[in-house]
Every structure is written in structure tokens, then in C-alpha cells.
């Protein structure tokens, strides 16, 4: 190693006599140099070493390219540096990141693949484990120069030298194989360790188990077991929508077990979807688990009881929700009516409605609707009494007096008070004037989910909330300028957003607890997020339904913040932030489906005015999954969670997406419209079971839009007069609302600037107009939900 560094002149004089250095030994890292003045030989440190790569660790903790460099450094520093027979210094000041390390391994594999494997096998190691193992076997035999079954640092240094794999390009070298994959720290790589380093895993997953389907019933627990097997299998990692679950510390998915199984303690419809498992470090071998969540049927009938005179028509309707979609059957007094069908007695809307024309006394009975699916059975009774009008039975009296109270009415709040309207006959049942303890009444721009026997309104000028129940009137003090109300049935709470002033400088959120109780009501402020109230722009609480009767969390939107603030509705306290910053999304509006637990977020336009696609947020992991394809606009979700309807006024588009019973969001189909849609309302189909239609109001034109969601069939309902102009209605971007009439409701209401229009949803036409109602832009249905 050192011979070539001593020139012949060191050993022979100019006259051919022996040099003064001929018999002088200077030691490692030094050489003899003749002093021409004295003629004596002197030992000096080597000027340089011959380039040679055989790295060695010094006792000073530094790594030297070879022994010569170590001894030369010892000489130059005047201190003893000995060779350390360990590789610790190989990794000192090592800036090799895991991503760089993976790229190095890929480079080494590709290099040896091209050099030693036949052309027909080139590249096969990328996704073929057998080909990868064959390549790594060839590499191990080559790396293991002394054929002792293991590879040490010296052998790695020779490969580095031969292949030119030093740190010229990357901070990583083959020495990092020892750093990351020498499991027992013996400074050697066994064949198994070499396999692990180069991702040759002797793990197995039978082909018939690559996809596993697990069905669970809502409310039960579920266990997903990873079928990847093998000796020394690394820990199992689980993903949902590309998000690792193991580190999230989720409340309902928090025990992964010794065998790597995924435990869901209480299954809900939000948990449905695909989960994947793989061994840590081996993402290419993964198993997909599809969790299907079944829900037993939950049934409602309408009406619960009715009295009819002979000769008229009677209808009994049934609605059931569940997963899979329930099958319906009817019984009369315990007997199947399927065998009794006739021209007089028919089943309509795919069996969800019993229609009896020209009723007779013998049609009196208890009609039981039965709903069945794979998860269970439910039933409910609708009673029909056929009686002469002269007979004042209790059933007759109850039937005839229904509607004389406050139920099954539209309540319209406007500048001249409140009008209570019965939609069937278009009758104004009552006009509550402002002088009736409601001076200068103005009301919330949108009152959502109002109590069945209770009406909530807000008086902006007096900062009060009115609660009206039959004959009683009470008021609740609120913050100034209340603009949005929402009744959360799950917790019997009313949530209230106030602006503080017209410039929205002092917005607040307040909650009224025990809202339907016979107690003294008052508002409670929610906990400010980040100790700031003045940023609140909006809030969103998912609507409860038949199979989603408990809503745990809501969202708060802050002005100009790319984040959703998650709140616990039970404690009205802040839980966490869901960041939208990666997508530069300032949330504008939100909707939600319980089928998979997805939030759909409409983003505000960017600084150039360009619209952004909606974001999809996973409600299980509280992470953004990504964009909802190229869908833009305000999202609306049908009450059963199976349709997402997005309205983009700028593009004149309504885009409809189905959401399957397994939580799969389908491709959109488009409906082009120039109506400038202001609001949407969903209504159950009168012709098909488990289907919904949607009605849309126009903010600028005099038509309304009807769409059959399953088929995309469109119809226009004309002559609804002009809406209140947007500048005249600053409380909401929806200057013409559209309100439905509950689960079994046939009618919808939408206002114009000076009138109210009632639409017949069964016939898809205008039912009537009620005039002289100026700016009746707050419409609430009170009755059967």
C-alpha cells in the first residue's frame, strides 16, 4: 500500500551510491526525505496517499478512505490514531435519510439487474417477488467475496469501489445497509438480513385472501384480521383512505391487538369502506378489507291513524330505511294483503303505499307495514277507520281536528309578522301581527330543523329569540343580529350564530339546551376557539335521520382560515382542527353523508376568482382524502345520504353523484341550467321506493327546477314571480329558499318578493299563490318530520 509512495531517489544517491534513506524506516504515514545540505535522511509525513478505497475507522472517531490516510493524519496531527475494528464511525455525521436510502437500494438493484440478469427479466424485480429474490441471491453471492455466508464492511467497500457507489451523488452508501439492517449488530449481514434490506420478504398472502369482505351490523364490534403471514413478520400497519390508523389514537379504533388485527369497538355507517393492511416496510404486499355495515330497518308510517267516510279515497304510506334497502310488505289485521289486491285496493310506489279508492266500512282495520333486510325486521301500524260523518267517535274527532293546532303547517316570517299556512287548501290559518309582543320583527335567514311542536324565530332589533308552543310565548335573550338557527335533535339543542353588527365584526355562537323542555331557557356561549370569537363565519351540524339519530360532532368555519374546527356537540367544546391548508381552501359551505362518514367542503374562489374543486374529508380520520374529482359548487346531501347534489352557479351546473350503500362516491352526471339556483329541497319519490327528487329555487328567474335524481329527468315549474333581490336580503346568500314539508310531505314552499308559492311535489306543479307577503324569506315547516 505504501511502496509506490517512496520514489527511487529516496534510496539511491545521484552518484549511484546508497541513499541516506536506504536503511531508514520512518513508520506508517511517514517517509524518508534526504536533506541535501546535511546529506542525512529525515522522516516526514506523507505528502499524499495513493487513491484507494478501503474505508477504516480511526480511534479518533473519524472515517478514513484507507489505512494510509489514517496513518498520514496521525503523523500530521502528532497524535496516535489506531484502527478501530468496528463500523460505528461509518455512520457518524451520516446525513443519509430514509428516502435517500431507499433510492440507493433501488439504484443498486437496477444496476445489478441490468448487469447480471437476462434481458427478458429486466425490471421484473419491481413487482415480481420471485424475480426480486433471484436477483438478490445473485447480488449476495457477489457481495460475499469470501463465501462465508455473510457480508462485512470490507466486502461492501470493495463493491462500492468497483461500482463507483461512493457519496458523490447521495449521502447514502452501501455501508448504510449495516446501519439499517444489521439486526443483531454483529457488523455482518446474513442472507436473511440482506433479504430484509432489499425488500425480499418471505411473507405470504394467499391470492384468495387479497381482498376480504367483512359484514357487520351497526352497533356491534368488528375485527379485521390481516392475513399476511411469515416468520418474523414486522408489525402490521393499517390504512384507511391512505391514512395510517395506528398512530391516530382514535376513540373507536384504538386496539390493534398482538396479532395486528384491527378492532372497531362500535360499528357505525361512518366506518364502512376499504381498509388495507401491510407489514411495516413492505407496502407492496397488502391486503384489502372491505367493511360492509348493515343497518336493521327503521320504519315510519303515515298517517298513524285516519278516519274516512265511505266512498272517498284513502292512502297509507310507509317509509323504511336500512342497509341493504329494506323490502316492504303490508298486512291487514294480520293477513297479507297481496292476495287481496284489486282495482279498489292497490299497491303503489313499489309497494310503499296502499291506495284504497271508494272505501267501504269493511276497509276499516290495522294496516301493518313490515320492512325486512339482512340485518333485521321492523314494522309499524297505520289505522284506517271508515265511518259515517254523523258518528262522532274519538278517532273521527281526532282526525277531523288534526291541523287545527300548530302542526302540519308552513310558518312564514316576514316584515308584517308570522303567517301560518295550511298547504293543502292554501289557507292562512293565522296571522300573528308584530304588535302581538313581536314588535319590529325580523327573523333568522335560515331556521333549520325546527321542533315539531315549537317554533323558533329571532328578533334582530330586540336581540331576542321567540319560542312559541301552542298558546304560550316566551323570549330568550341573544347576542345582537342573530342570523342562523339550527336545532340539533340528538342533544335537544338550538345553535345560534349572531353577527354582532351588520359588518359581522362581533360574531358569536350560542347554544340553548333542553330546547324542547318545559324549562326556563337561556343561551350559553360556546368555548371560543383560539380564544377568539370574532372569526366565526358559519357552523355546520349534520342533520339527524332515521338511521343517524345521534350526531356527535359539528364543524365551525372561521373567516379566511383554511381549516375546519371540530366541536363535540355533547360538551359544546373544541376537539381539533382539520387543516385544509395543503389545498389552500377557505371553506364556504359543508355537507355530510353518513355512508362512509364523508364531509364535502365547498372552497371559496382563489384570489383570481377561479373556483376550486370540493374537498372530501374522512370523518373517521379527520383528514382530507383529496378533491371530489372536478366537482365545484355548494354541496347538498339527500336525507338518506345516497345523493350528493352540487350547484355551481358560475358554471350553470347541477352535478349529481350517487353514494352507494358501501360508501362509494360515484362519477357525477351533469344538468345544465341557467336558473342561478338559490336553494334546494329534497323530497321522497311518490313513484319509487328508496328514491328522492330535488326541487330548486331560482335567485334571479321566475322558474323552479324539478329533478328526478335516479334518472336525471328534469321539469320546469314556471310563473313564480321575481325573488327578493340579493342586496335586499343580506342575511344569507340564499335570497329565495325552498322548504319541504317533512318525510311524507307532498308540498313545498318558496317565496317571491311579494308572494308565497306552494308547489305540489306529487304532481310536480304549482299548487297555489298566496299574495301580499313581502320578503317572506324565512319558511319553516312545523309538523310531521
Cite the ranges covered by each PLM segment:
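Immunoglobulin-superfamily
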Residues: 34-36, 50, 88-143, 153, ...
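Acidic carboxylate motifs that coordinate Ca2+ or other divalent cations, activating on Asp/Glu
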Residues: 62, 144-148, 184-186
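Repeated scaffold domains used in trafficking and secretory/extracellular systems
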Residues: 391-401, 436-447, 477-489, 528-547, ...
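Residue position within the beta-strands of beta-propeller blades
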Residues: 412, 451-453, 496, 556, ...
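Structural motif
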Residues: 417-421, 457-464, 503-511, 561-566, ...
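A short beta-strand motif characteristic of beta-propeller blades
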Residues: 427-439, 469-476, 518-537, 573-581, ...
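Blade-level signature of beta-propeller repeat domains, shared across WD40, Kelch, NHL, RCC1
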Residues: 742-785
Amino acid at each position: 500500500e505504501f511502496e509506490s509512495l517512496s520514489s527511487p531517489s529516496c534510496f539511491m544517491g545521484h552518484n549511484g551510491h546508497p541513499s541516506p534513506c536506504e536503511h531508514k524506516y520512518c513508520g506508517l504515514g511517514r517517509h524518508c526525505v534526504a536533506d541535501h545540505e546535511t546529506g542525512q535522511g529525515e522522516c516526514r509525513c506523507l505528502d499524499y496517499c495513493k487513491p484507494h478505497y478501503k474505508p477504516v475507522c480511526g480511534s479518533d472517531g473519524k472515517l478514513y478512505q484507507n489505512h494510509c490516510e489514517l496513518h498520514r493524519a496521525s503523523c500530521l496531527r502528532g497524535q496516535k490514531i489506531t484502527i478501530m475494528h468496528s463500523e460505528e464511525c461509518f455512520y457518524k455525521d451520516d446525513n443519509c435519510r430514509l428516502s435517500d436510502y431507499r433510492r440507493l437500494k433501488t439504484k443498486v438493484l437496477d444496476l445489478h439487474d441490468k448487469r447480471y440478469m437476462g434481458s427478458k427479466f429486466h425490471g421484473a424485480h419491481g413487482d415480481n417477488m420471485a424475480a426480486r429474490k433471484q436477483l438478490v441471491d445473485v447480488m449476495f453471492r457477489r457481495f460475499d467475496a469470501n463465501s462465508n455466508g455473510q457480508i462485512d464492511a470490507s466486502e461492501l467497500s470493495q463493491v462500492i469501489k468497483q461500482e463507483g457507489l461512493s457519496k458523490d451523488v447521495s449521502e447514502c452508501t452501501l455501508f448504510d445497509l449495516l446501519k439499517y439492517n444489521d439486526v443483531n449488530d454483529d457488523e455482518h449481514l446474513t442472507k436473511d438480513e440482506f433479504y430484509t434490506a432489499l425488500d425480499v420478504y418471505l411473507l405470504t398472502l394467499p391470492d384468495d385472501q387479497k381482498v376480504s369482505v367483512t359484514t357487520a351490523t351497526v352497533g356491534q364490534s368488528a375485527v379485521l384480521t390481516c392475513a399476511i403471514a411469515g416468520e418474523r413478520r414486522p408489525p402490521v400497519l393499517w390504512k384507511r383512505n391512505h391514512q395510517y390508523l395506528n398512530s391516530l389514537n382514535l376513540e373507536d379504533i384504538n386496539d390493534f391487538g398482538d396479532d395486528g388485527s384491527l378492532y372497531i369497538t362500535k360499528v357505525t355507517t361512518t366506518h364502512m369502506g376499504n381498509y388495507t393492511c401491510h407489514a411495516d416496510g413492505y407496502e407492496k404486499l397488502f391486503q384489502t378489507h372491505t367493511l360492509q355495515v348493515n343497518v336493521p330497518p327503521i320504519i315510519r308510517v303515515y298517517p298513524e291513524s285516519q278516519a274516512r267516510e265511505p266512498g272517498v279515497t284513502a292512502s297509507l304510506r310507509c317509509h323504511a330505511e336500512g342497509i341493504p334497502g329494506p323490502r316492504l310488505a303490508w298486512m291487514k289485521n294480520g293477513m297479507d294483503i297481496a292476495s287481496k289486491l284489486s282495482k279498489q285496493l292497490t299497491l303503489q310506489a313499489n309497494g310503499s303505499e296502499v291506495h284504497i279508492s271508494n272505501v267501504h266500512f269493511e276497509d276499516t282495520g290495522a294496516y301493518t307495514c313490515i320492512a325486512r333486510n339482512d340485518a333485521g325486521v321492523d314494522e309499524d301500524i297505520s289505522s284506517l277507520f271508515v265511518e259515517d260523518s254523523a258518528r262522532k267517535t274519538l278517532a273521527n274527532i281526532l282526525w277531523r281536528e288534526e291541523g287545527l293546532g300548530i302542526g302540519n303547517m308552513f310558518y312564514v316570517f316576514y316584515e308584517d309578522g308570522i303567517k301560518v299556512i295550511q298547504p293543502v287548501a292554501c289557507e292562512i290559518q293565522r296571522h300573528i301581527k308584530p304588535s302581538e309582543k313581536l314588535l319590529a320583527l325580523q327573523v333568522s335567514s335560515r331556521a333549520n330543523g325546527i321542533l315539531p311542536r315549537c317554533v323558533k324565530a329571532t328578533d334582530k332589533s330586540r336581540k331576542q329569540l321567540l319560542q312559541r308552543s301552542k298558546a304560550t310565548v316566551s323570549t330568550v335573550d341573544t347576542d345582537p343580529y342573530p342570523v342562523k338557527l339550527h336545532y340539533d335533535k340528538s342533544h335537544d339543542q338550538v345553535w345560534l350564530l349572531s353577527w354582532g353588527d351588520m359588518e359581522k365584526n362581533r360574531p358569536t355562537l350560542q347554544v340553548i339546551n333542553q330546547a324542547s323542555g318545559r324549562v326556563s331557557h337561556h343561551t350559553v356561549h360556546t368555548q371560543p376557539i383560539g380564544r377568539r370569537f370574532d372569526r366565526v363565519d358559519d357552523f355546520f351540524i349534520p342533520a339527524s335521520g332515521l338511521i343517524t339519530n345521534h350526531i356527535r360532532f359539528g364543524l365551525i368555519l372561521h373567516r379566511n382560515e383554511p381549516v375546519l374546527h371540530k366541536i363535540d356537540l355533547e360538551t359544546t367544546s373544541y376537539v381539533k382542527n382539520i387543516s385544509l391548508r395543503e389545498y389552500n381552501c377557505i371553506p364556504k359551505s359543508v355537507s355530510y353523508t353518513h355512508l362512509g362518514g364523508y364531509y364535502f367542503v365547498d372552497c371559496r374562489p382563489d384570489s383570481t376568482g377561479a373556483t376550486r374543486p370540493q374537498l372530501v374529508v374522512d370523518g373517521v380520520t379527520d383528514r382530507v382524502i383529496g378533491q371530489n374529482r372536478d366537482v365545484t359548487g355548494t354541496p347538498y346531501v339527500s336525507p338518506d345520504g345516497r345523493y350528493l347534489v352540487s350547484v355551481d352557479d358560475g358554471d350553470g351546473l347541477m352535478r349529481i353523484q350517487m353514494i352507494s350503500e358501501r360508501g362509494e362516491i360515484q362519477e357525477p352526471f351533469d344538468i345544465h341550467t341557467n336558473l342561478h339556483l338559490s336553494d334546494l329541497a329534497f323530497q321522497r319519490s311518490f313513484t319509487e321506493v328508496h328514491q328522492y327528487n330535488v326541487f330548486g329555487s331560482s335567485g334571479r328567474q321566475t322558474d323552479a327546477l324539478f329533478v328526478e335524481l335516479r334518472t336525471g329527468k328534469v321539469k320546469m315549474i314556471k310563473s313564480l314571480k321575481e325573488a327578493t333581490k340579493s342586496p335586499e336580503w343580506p342575511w344569507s346568500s340564499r335570497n329565495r329558499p325552498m322548504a319541504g314539508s317533512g318525510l311524507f310531505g307532498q308540498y313545498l314552499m318558496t317565496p317571491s318578493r311579494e308572494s308565497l308559492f306552494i308547489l305540489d311535489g306529487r304532481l310536480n306543479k304549482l299548487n297555489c299563490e298566496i299574495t301580499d307577503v313581502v320578503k317572506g324569506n324565512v319558511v319553516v315547516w312545523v309538523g310531521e318530520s
